Amino acid sequence: MRILYLASLLFLITLYLSPTFGWGGGRDCESHRSEYTCKSDRSCAYLPFVSCCGKKEFFCVNRDHRNCCDDLSCAKNTRTGEIFEIWSSCKPHRDFVPYHSPNTTTCESLGCEARGMECEWVESSPCYGTSCCPRIPRCVGHHGGGHKCDRMRCPEGFYCEEQGGSACCVPHHDGCGNIQCPWGHYCVNEHGKCRCVPHRPPPRPPVDQCRNQHCPHGYSCRVIKGCATCVRDARPPHNLCRGFGCPEGSHCEVLEKHPVCVRNHVPPHPPPPPQICGSVNCGPGYICTIINGHPTCIRGDGYLCNQTRCPHDYQCETISTNIVKCSPKNDECKWHRCPPGSSCFNSRNGPHCLANNVFPQLCKVTQCPTDFSCKMIRGNPTCIKARPPVPPPHCSTCAELSSACNHVGMICIQVPSNCTNTRFPCCPSHPICIHPSTTAASTIATTASTVATTTSATTAGTTTGGTTTGGSTSDSSAASSADSSAASSSPSSSAASSAASSEPSSSAASSSAPSSASSSAPSSASSSAPSSSASSSAASSAASSESSESSSATS
């Protein structure tokens, strides 16, 4: 009796565990030929699995004691040769054997660089749609072609090296034999010098395109020709659709008792992932932000505050790129309203209103950034960026003064103006006449820096004077200043000026050239670039021949 009891118990245990162990032992759920009969059997599960080429197929498998939990593995159909990705612990057994991915090697283990070759990721055969069929590495020659040293056999103590596009044998103590390049680089010898150059990065492994795709009810995602496509779940076709052919990219459906071809649903491709600022290293005072999908370095809010020094118990706040405000740390005046002409002041007795004319001038203890000026606004010292001076409606150029300069043997140049008072219009530069010199570049630079302030003040006096005599005097003083600067830098000019000072002045020259120069040279200046016409040999000869006339005009 006891033996019969033990035999019955062993038989029950075998029936319970038979779906889990063995390949086809126990109850064979794979004998079911339809989805209905499989789902009607409680010991069976109807599960879909995907092949490497994107084919989705349903299998009736035995349930196990783990309720078919996730257990990723690979299996190969011995009848068709297809490789399926099995995502469940309930696996098909009939005509299936376990399959191990061939991707057991890496680029590091192949050691392609040591052989002067590159590592390249190639597709598995026949497809690489799942994790069971990933890309595998292999060694290839440079740029995907054969290596020229593959067929070269060097004698002992030598090795093959590609130099100038040709394979040659070099001794081990020379060339790239002892060069150890970092990972991702290989050694090349160019003109007798060795250097490490980077390899092409391997292509990224394939991504499961169906992972983030959502198909309508009754459809499942499949990768067809590299595109994620929603295909109707596998089920017996309708009787009317049997033998009804549809073109590629569509399938048969029965609508109002008639078979029709319906286009397969293709979900829209998601937008590419945005570039992030994690790998961007901006300089100090700059932050990274995404502009038009690209990481861009812009000035951070703290850049201006780093250059601002606020009063005690005040903190800096960047309002815009042109305004920086210093506000109290304990801003109790935030909700305190004051009448016009007064501002809130937070003292020891609390916030109260003070007239603006008696309000503490905190700008005296506030340091603003460069090109910013402090102004009290609503009781807070505020740094405001100074606006550039407004140019006048017309600025003179050398095109207007060159004829007058040439008449007295001089050339015209543009010099910067002294626009310190931004409340009035000011031209950034203005034309003046100087003596030509063989060292024109240094003379122009020296003259421009010397007469910038003097000329701007002189032209202002000419404008206010409004007479021909005043304009003539100002032009003469500008010319004298230019002569003295040119004389200090040019020996020939010094000799010319000393010779001119010993001769008597000519009233005829004094009454013609300077007056015409003053009438054609307005006080304002031009923002155009300085004249490109430098001194020439003709101008130099004219200057030496008319030195007495220019000296008379100057006096």
From Swiss-Prot:
Induction: By exogenous cAMP, repressed by DIF.
Identification of the protein by name: Prespore protein Dp87
Compartments reported by the entry: Spore wall
A single GO cellular-component term on record: spore wall
Biased amino acid composition, Low complexity: 470-555
Gene Ontology biological process terms from the UniProt entry: sporulation resulting in formation of a cellular spore
The DSCP-N domain, residue ranges: 27-144
